[in-house]
Amino acid sequence: MNFTPTRTPICRKISFASKRGAGSGFGDTNRWKKMADSMESTPLPSVEDRLAVLCPSQELLEYYQKKMANCESENEDLLKKLELYREACEEQHKLEWNLQQREEEIAELQKALSDMQVCLFQEREHVLRLYSENDRLRIRELEDKKKIQNLLALVGPDAGEVTYFHKEPPHRVSILQKTLQAAVACEPSASKADPGVSKRQVRIKDKEGISERHQRDTEMLLLQVEALQAQLGEQTKLSREQVEGLMEDRRIRVEEIQVQHQRNQEKIMELTKSLHHTQELLYESTKDFLQLKFENQNKEKVWMLEKDHLMSKITQYRAQCKKKEDKLGKVVPILHESHHTQNEYIKSLKDKLIQEKKLSNMYQEQCISLEEELARIREEEGVRREIFKDRSNKMGKRLQIMTKRYQALEHRRALEVEGFKTDIKSLRQKLRDLEQMLYKATMNNTHGDQDLAMLCEVRDSNRRAHKIQGELKNLKSKVFGLENALRLC
């Protein structure tokens, strides 16, 4: 945009002065001689002196006042646009900061979820260890009972002694009262019988004891095998769940790494694109600068040629004026005073003309500088607009990615909730089965001590069940807390 008009009031004033000088010029040689002497003798005043002496016309003042008002209005518009761009950039930075905080919170929640899974696996391992310890203690109890029975069979009980044994759950009472009475009754008869018959009975009893011992050993081994198989099944299930959880965590980590890599690639592409754009702008600006410099050099050359041409014309006119002075100096001495006043007037007009030229050059330089500043501001505005569009597109893509990740987390949470519900149902079913078994066992037993023992065991099992239910409630509350946190995110 060029603010310099094609024909300003300065140009009209200069042309008017030149016409006036041309109309009153060539008729008087003395005037031209004094003009040349004044041009050689008069020094060029400073800018402050010229501005102090300058009396611009009303048209010139109105013209430049209008130009300055237009420049100020354009400057205000540009400042408003820059303020809008600044607000948009601040809002974008705020959104980016909030997005980064949400990503950090999601990462922390994922870490907490993985920690909770690890704790759950540890609790399950602890429960399995307790189950295995319980089985081991039961097997050991059976072994101890068998040893006690063997010792009682070898030693023999007293006359009125009755021993009760619990074989395996459900607790069944084994009453050995008849065998003991038979053994007591056989003692006097054995003393009266023959020694051969007693030896046969001893051998038969030994064989029966050995067969019973083998049967007990086989039952104990079968119980151990069943307990080990159950432990192995639980361990395999737990290890499978651990492997699945680790694979799921690995998949999530791989997806996060891929998303981060894609973001880095997009950022690199944007930076390279902006670099190429700035390089192109730099190339264009340097090219324009060199072109303007070359044009200015050509203009300076033309101005120098015009100056030389004008100086040659001035020397010619001086020579002609001297010749005419020599010819006409003797003819018109009366007009010397009028020529002197005219020369002074011409000198003042020339000074004004020079001052106006300097002032016009100064205004032209100011207009050129303002045009350059306006072009620079427009270029910066275009660049910022492109950057804003790119950033808005990136924010839209990031929002889509975050919504997808949130949907995946919601799906995963729903699956985990279903898994917890199924676990709770299975544990409740096991608890009901255990209560039924205990009820049946209590209904089958008739002895008072056995009922008391069964009631104690029922109470212990109820305590354990309440403890497991409390742990399940805590886990459920943690899951609901994580769900609420994810919804808030």
Swiss-Prot record:
Keywords: Coiled coil, Phosphoprotein. The keyword Transport does not apply. The modification Phosphoserine is found at S38. GO terms for cellular component: centrosome. Residues 57-120, 212-487 form a coiled coil. It comes from the Eukaryota. The keyword Glycoprotein does not apply. This is Coiled-coil domain-containing protein 77. It comes from Mus musculus.
